């Protein structure tokens, strides 16, 4: 081990730790980092360390592959329309069971195994996330759009030393349960908390001018420059909704949004605590 190199890395991280200490950061946990056991350990380690240095951390997760896997066991086909899962009554039962009962609790357990304190929540708890059925366009069943975020439970959890781990399920005024897109849920929570940062873990390095060439990664992106990337067809496909979430979050008061590659070991620490970072920062 090169002790000088280790000391140098730790020393260089100091101004970033000071910058984020006491600030709120909301992380969307998903992609390969949620499926690969080794990557999962890297991310959980990062989350616990971030909490230990004084960051007010909130984790939001989906779990699409786990839902699809369970539906397959029930011989029920997963149907997607414009990237959103068609959610009938039976599918909603599975979504709630898998996200809140399995994925959420596994994450809480893992965080605690690394020495962190975590509290598993879903939007139904304390009517934290309110939603209504998406009424425009094609009928998606019990897929909702968020109408309100009650931050009281989230803030109370943070103040008591916990990492709130939130599954993207919401409660309607009609007392129905709604499936919420996890990216959208993350940015809505970040906006409601007026978070310092929103971080989306993905399976791509970030926003790139050429998706086949990692050297074309755009490391910093101003809000005013995004329109040109839309027009040049650089932002397209699966990146579109993620960028839209980042833009809306910043317009709502979040200081910066980051799209990073969850397949990179310790991606969160490298993005936040180094000068170069590893992904795209939008501000």
Curated annotation (Swiss-Prot):
Database matches in CDD domains? AAK_NAGK-C
- Any Gene Ontology biological process: arginine biosynthetic process via ornithine
Domain of life of the source: Bacteria
GO MF annotations in UniProt: acetylglutamate kinase activity; ATP binding
Tell me which EC number(s) this protein carries.
Answer: 2.7.2.8
Principal location class: cytoplasm
This one is known as Acetylglutamate kinase
Query: What species is this protein from?
Result: Clostridium kluyveri (strain ATCC 8527 / DSM 555 / NBRC 12016 / NCIMB 10680 / K1)
GN (gene name): argB
């Amino acid at each position: 081990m090169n002790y000088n190199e280790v000391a140098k890395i730790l020393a260089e991280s100091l101004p970033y730790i000071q910058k984020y200490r006491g600030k709120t950061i909301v992380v969307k946990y998903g992609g390969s980092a949620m499926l690969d056991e080794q990557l999962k350990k890297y991310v959980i380690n990062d989350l616990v360390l971030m909490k230990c240095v004084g960051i007010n951390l909130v984790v939001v997760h989906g779990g699409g592959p786990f839902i699809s896997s369970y539906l397959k066991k029930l011989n029920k086909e997963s149907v997607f329309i414009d990237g959103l899962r068609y959610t009938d009554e039976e599918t909603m039962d599975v979504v709630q069971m898998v996200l809140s009962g399995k994925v959420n609790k596994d994450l809480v357990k893992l965080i605690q195994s690394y020495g962190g304190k975590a509290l598993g929540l879903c939007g139904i708890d304390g009517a934290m996330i309110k939603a209504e059925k998406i009424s425009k366009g094609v009928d998606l069943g019990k897929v909702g759009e968020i109408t309100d975020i009650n931050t009281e439970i989230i803030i109370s959890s943070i103040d008591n030393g916990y990492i709130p781990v939130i599954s993207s399920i919401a409660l309607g005024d009609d007392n129905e349960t709604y499936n919420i897109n996890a990216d959208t849920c993350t940015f809505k929570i970040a906006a409601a908390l007026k978070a310092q940062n929103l971080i989306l873990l993905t399976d791509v390095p970030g926003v790139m001018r050429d998706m086949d060439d990692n050297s074309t990664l755009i490391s910093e992106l101003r809000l005013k420059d995004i329109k040109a990337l839309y027009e040049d067809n650089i932002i397209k496909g699966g990146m579109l909704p993620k960028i839209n979430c980042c833009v809306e979050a910043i317009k709502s008061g979040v200081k910066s949004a980051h799209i990073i590659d969850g397949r990179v070991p310790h991606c969160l620490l490298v993005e936040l605590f180094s000068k170069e970072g590893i992904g795209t920062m939008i501000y």
